[in-house]
Amino acid sequence: MSAPDKEKEKEKEETNNKSEDLGLLEEDDEFEEFPAEDFRVGDDEEELNVWEDNWDDDNVEDDFSQQLKAHLESKKMET
């Protein structure tokens, strides 16, 4: 085979490889259809309590706050 013939064969192989690659890319572009789900099914159930009802207590004189105040007062006197 002569050099020009070898070059033509290489070009044909490269063209074939490119067309195969394009075929694979086109398959990736398709979107998969999923069935629609009905999310309202759980609406009939009783609502769950996600957080504690007493999270926003106005009780600032609880045991922790008293201990903290006492600790801070003792630190003030030490310095």
Curated annotation (Swiss-Prot):
Region (Disordered): 1-30
SMART domains (UniProt xref): DSS1_SEM1
Keyword annotations of the record: Phosphoprotein, Proteasome
One annotated Gene Ontology cellular component of this protein: nucleoplasm
InterPro entries cross-referenced by the UniProt entry: DSS1_SEM1
Ranges of Basic and acidic residues composition bias in the record: 1-21
Gene Ontology biological-process entries: double-strand break repair via homologous recombination; mRNA export from nucleus; proteasome assembly; proteasome-mediated ubiquitin-dependent protein catabolic process
Cross-referenced Pfam families: DSS1_SEM1
Coiled-coil zones: none
PTM sites of type Phosphoserine: S19
Similarity comment text for this entry: Belongs to the DSS1/SEM1 family.
PANTHER family in UniProt: 26 PROTEASOME COMPLEX SUBUNIT DSS1, 26S PROTEASOME COMPLEX SUBUNIT SEM1
Reported function: Subunit of the 26S proteasome which plays a role in ubiquitin-dependent proteolysis.
Record note on quaternary structure: Part of the 26S proteasome.
Name of the protein in question: Probable 26S proteasome complex subunit sem1
Organism of this sequence: Drosophila melanogaster
